[in-house]
C-alpha cells in the first residue's frame, strides 16, 4: 500500500506544471562537454541554446580571451590534482603509509566564473503551449517569431516569480507526505532487504506555509490551433 502511495506522489510531482526550464549557460571549450546547450561563441558571435544572439563587443571579446586563458589554467590544475589523488590512492592500495586520500571537493580547483555576457537571463527558457520564450524573444519551434512587448516582459517576470514559489511548495508538500508516510524508518532497506534496518540520520520534513500559494496564470504569448 505504501509503495502504491509513493508512486502516486511521484506521479503528482511529475504532473506539476513546469513551464520554465533553466538551461545552465556555459561556454563550450575544447575537450569538455560541448554542444549548443548554454552559451557558445564562434567567430565572435554569441549563441544561447543554439539561437544566435549578437556579436560580441570589443570589451566582451577581451573578456572571452581572459576566460579562455583561465579555463586553460583550470583544466591543467584540475588534471594535476586528479593525478595526485590517483597516485595517493595507488600508494594506499599498495600498502604504503601516507596521508589519507581526501575526498573533499574543497581541495579541487574551482572553475572560472562565466563571462558577463552569458547570464541566466540569456539562457533561461520558458516553454509554453505552442511556443518558447528565451531572452524576451518568442520562438515557434526553432524559428524566431517576435520580441516580447514591455508589458509582456513584466508579465513574464511576475509569472516566473510566482511559478518558482508554487513549484517549491509542491515539492515540499510531496516531501512532507512521504516523511509522514514512512516516518524515520529506512524504507528501502526494509523493502528490499527484509532484515534489520541500519540506523540512519533522518531529515525533518520541510515546513509548509499556512496558506498554499496560488498557481499563477500562464501568460498568453502565443495561441496554438487544435
Curated annotation (Swiss-Prot):
Identify one Pfam family in the record: Pepsin-I3
Primary residence: secreted
SUPFAM superfamilies tied to this protein: Pepsin inhibitor-3
Which cellular component appears as one GO term in the record? extracellular region
User: Where are the residues of the annotated region Disordered?
Assistant: 95-116, 196-218
Which cysteines pair up through disulfides? They are 131-222
Q: Which family does it belong to?
A: Belongs to the protease inhibitor I33 family.
What is the name listed in the Swiss-Prot or TrEMBL entry for this protein? Aspartyl protease inhibitor
Please report the organism this UniProt entry assigns to the protein.
Answer: Parelaphostrongylus tenuis (Meningeal worm)
